Swiss-Prot record:
The gene is rps2402. This is Small ribosomal subunit protein eS24B. It is found in: Cytoplasm; Nucleus, Nucleolus. The lineage of its organism: Eukaryota, Fungi, Dikarya, Ascomycota, Taphrinomycotina. Component of the small ribosomal subunit (SSU). Mature yeast ribosomes consist of a small (40S) and a large (60S) subunit. The 40S small subunit contains 1 molecule of ribosomal RNA (18S rRNA) and at least 33 different proteins. The large 60S subunit contains 3 rRNA molecules (25S, 5.8S and 5S rRNA) and at least 46 different proteins. Residues 100-134 are annotated as: Disordered. Belongs to the eukaryotic ribosomal protein eS24 family.
C-alpha cells in the first residue's frame, strides 16, 4: 500500500535542551488514503536511523483534495527523554503510558454533596468515614 508514498521533512531543528529533533513533515500519498501515525513513525525512524519508539508524530492534516498531508514530528534521543518531556496524553496514544483512571463524575458529585450536609467536628469524622469506605 505504501509504495508510492513520499515523506519529506522541512524546518528541521535540533533541540538539545529537550533532547530531540523536531521538524515539519510533508507526506505525499497521491491516490491513496492517509498513512497511519504508526507507519509514519516507522518511516521516520528508518530515515533518521533510530528506534520507532522514540518518534512522535502529531498534528497531521490532509490538504483539500487529498494526496498531501502535513504534520509535526519529534524524534527523541531516548525513550527516557521522551517520557520526561512529552505530554502524558501523547504517551498514552502511542502506548508508552497508562491512562489516568478517574473517579466517575457522578461519584465525585455525590461525595461533594455528602460533605455539604455535615458541619463542624462532624465534618472531620465524616471525611474519615468516607475515606474508609473508598
Amino acid at each position: 500500500m505504501s509504495e508510492a508514498v513520499t515523506i519529506r521533512t522541512r524546518k528541521f531543528m535540533t533541540n538539545r535542551l529537550l533532547q530531540r529533533k523536531q521538524m515539519v513533515v510533508d507526506i505525499l500519498h497521491p491516490g491513496k488514503a492517509n498513512l497511519s501515525k504508526n507507519e509514519i513513525r516507522e518511516k521516520l525512524a528508518q530515515m533518521y536511523k533510530t528506534d520507532s519508539e522514540c518518534v512522535q508524530a502529531f498534528g497531521l492534516r490532509t490538504h483539500f483534495g487529498g494526496g498531501r498531508s502535513t504534520g509535526f514530528a519529534l524524534i527523541y534521543d531516548s525513550t527516557e527523554s521522551m517520557k520526561k518531556f512529552e505530554p502524558h496524553y501523547r504517551l498514552v496514544r502511542v502506548g508508552q503510558a497508562e491512562p489516568i483512571q478517574k473517579v466517575a463524575r457522578q461519584q465525585r458529585k455525590q461525595r461533594k454533596n455528602r460533605g455539604k450536609k455535615v458541619f463542624g467536628t462532624g465534618k472531620r469524622l465524616a471525611k474519615r468515614k468516607s475515606k474508609q469506605q473508598d
